[in-house]
Amino acid sequence: MYAVIATGGKQYRVAQGDVLRVEKLDAEAGATVEFDNVLLVGSGDDVKVGTPNVEGGKVTATVKAHGRGEKVMIIKFRRRKHHRKQMGHRQDFTEVEITGISG
């Protein structure tokens, strides 16, 4: 059984036991979170597509850890002006393990 969930402005295809990184969630490590924004639930040939969400669809997950992604370097440069601006950014994420899919 698999599902497509939306969280943090992105969509993820998940199955039970999957470990994935999502945008930072406000939950402690070890806590259980529920994703109610389920767009699709499938099991073999039986596929339920929501309009926009599947009624009664729910995905539960356990928060494994919080962290920060790799540093992305941003360089802004103006030619012939002796001007260069260099910045870095690290995005916060939450690592979750999918424990159940219903719907």
Curated annotation (Swiss-Prot):
SUPFAM superfamilies: L21p-like. PROSITE patterns: RIBOSOMAL_L21 (PS01169). InterPro entries: bL21-like, bL21-like_sf, Ribosomal_bL21, Ribosomal_bL21_CS. Keywords: Ribonucleoprotein, Ribosomal protein, RNA-binding, rRNA-binding. One of its GO terms (cellular component) is ribonucleoprotein complex. Pfam families: Ribosomal_L21p. The keyword Ribosomal protein applies. Belongs to the bacterial ribosomal protein bL21 family. Part of the 50S ribosomal subunit. Contacts protein L20. This protein binds to 23S rRNA in the presence of protein L20. This is Large ribosomal subunit protein bL21. It comes from Thioalkalivibrio sulfidiphilus (strain HL-EbGR7).
